[in-house]
Amino acid sequence: MRKGFTLLELLTVVMIISILAIIAIPQFFRVAERARASEAVNVLGIIRSAQLRYYAEHSATYATSLADLDVDVPPNNDDYKYFNAPNVGIAGQASMTRKNAGASIGNYTLTINYDTGDINCTGGAAGTCRRLGF
């Protein structure tokens, strides 16, 4: 009696593993990029809360600089791994742009509206914002 696997059995296992990898790898990259985007989403949420406090205390105007806000958000690009430093100088909005993304993702921008809290995504490679759920 022979012990071991036949060539057909080994090829079947290799095919099944290949099919699973083909399905799983794109999902992995999407989930990984979504996790990277959470860096910006968290910072933008903190800025929005600070801007709403500033708005209530300063005659219905928003701050135009991070230094004017009562938050501990780093102001320099080097302080962030995946995004550039936030821009709060936009009327009623703050934004952060992805840096050093590959060609398949592109450098997209996430923008939060202070009034509604909605986060919008623009730019990047075709379909990036849709794949990330924005």
Describe each model-derived feature in a short phrase:
Residues L52-F134:
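Periplasmic/extracellular, small/polar-rich flexible segments of pilin-like filament-forming proteins
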Residues G4-L8, V41, A63-L66, N107:
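Generic N-terminal initiation segments characterized by hydrophobic and/or small/turn-forming residues
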Residues L11-M15, R48, V73:
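Generic low-complexity, intrinsically disordered sequence content enriched
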Residues M1-A32:
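N-terminal single-pass transmembrane signal-anchor helix
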Residues I22, R30-L69:
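Conserved hydrophobic/amphipathic alpha-helical signal-anchor segments
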